[in-house]
UniProtKB/Swiss-Prot annotation:
The lineage of its organism: Bacteria, Bacillati, Actinomycetota, Actinomycetes, Mycobacteriales. One of its GO terms (biological process) is methionine biosynthetic process. Homodimer. It catalyses: (6R)-5,10-methylene-5,6,7,8-tetrahydrofolate + NADP(+) = (6R)-5,10-methenyltetrahydrofolate + NADPH; (6R)-5,10-methenyltetrahydrofolate + H2O = (6R)-10-formyltetrahydrofolate + H(+). PANTHER family: C-1-TETRAHYDROFOLATE SYNTHASE, CYTOPLASMIC (PTHR48099:SF5), C-1-TETRAHYDROFOLATE SYNTHASE, CYTOPLASMIC-RELATED (PTHR48099). It comes from the Bacteria. Belongs to the tetrahydrofolate dehydrogenase/cyclohydrolase family. GO terms for molecular function: methenyltetrahydrofolate cyclohydrolase activity; methylenetetrahydrofolate dehydrogenase (NADP+) activity. InterPro entries: Aminoacid_DH-like_N_sf, NAD(P)-bd_dom_sf, THF_DH/CycHdrlase, THF_DH/CycHdrlase_cat_dom, THF_DH/CycHdrlase_NAD-bd_dom. GO terms for cellular component: cytosol. This is Bifunctional protein FolD. The keyword Hydrolase applies. It comes from Mycolicibacterium fortuitum. NADP(+) binds at residues 168-170, 195, 236.
Amino acid sequence: MAPVGSIVLDGKATRDEIFVDLKQRVAKLTEAGRTPGLGTVLVGDDPGSQAYVRGKHADCAKVGINSIRRDLPADITQAQLDETIDELNANPDCTGYIVQLPLPKHLDENAALERIDPAKDADGLHPTNLGRLVLGKDAPLPCTPRGIVHLLRRFDVPIAGAHVVVIGRGVTVGRPMGLLLTRRSENATVTLCHTGTRDLPALTRQADIIIAAVGVPHMVTADMVKPGAAVVDVGVSRVDGKLTGDVAPDVWEVAGHVSPNPGGVGPLTRAFLLTNVVELEESKLA
């Protein structure tokens, strides 16, 4: 529970608002004979991946998007995976799709992601689309960074001119996060920190916004946070079988805004996966 004065960055409530909007937009597309379709490629029987995929298709049902599932055995070859990707690239009912990660170790994840048609890249992580983001060109945006920006705006956290410290340089959050936040529409100043950063607390104490995306339990503590700063908790790890974020509980006593984990960024990642698919279908009518 957040103490008095600390505002919860509520991802679930914000997701529900997005779903109301998406349901109306999908209904218009359906009237035009263009119901969007989200595809998923799931390899193997990892329980976490299965749960994520189930959740994505449940979200589709809520807003009227068609679901296209391709569930493959764990011992599939790279060539067989390529065939599935090629089939979805050519499938007119599939507006956009994702390859659920991680893949089994014998498969080349980068090769699989690069094989996705950039025009059907629901995750916004194809190298072509990341390049378009660098160039400031329209393309599907990475879902988690886009969700974080939306969440901050929804709760009136000032972004323009803010000093944002991003902890973590992964391709799904850390690296593209800086690209989104330094666009002219956001105009933040970003410091990207990682395992090689010297004196991380000295940097985080300067930050107006901290985005923690590392997967190290409770690594961001109250003494690292400037009073009143916004703290976004993205990282997920398991401690004694329980999902745990990167942000320690005592941060709630100092920060002005904090995203819970779970229940903060995760729901928006899924919401913007659907948003990307709807926007891809809408762009065909433009």
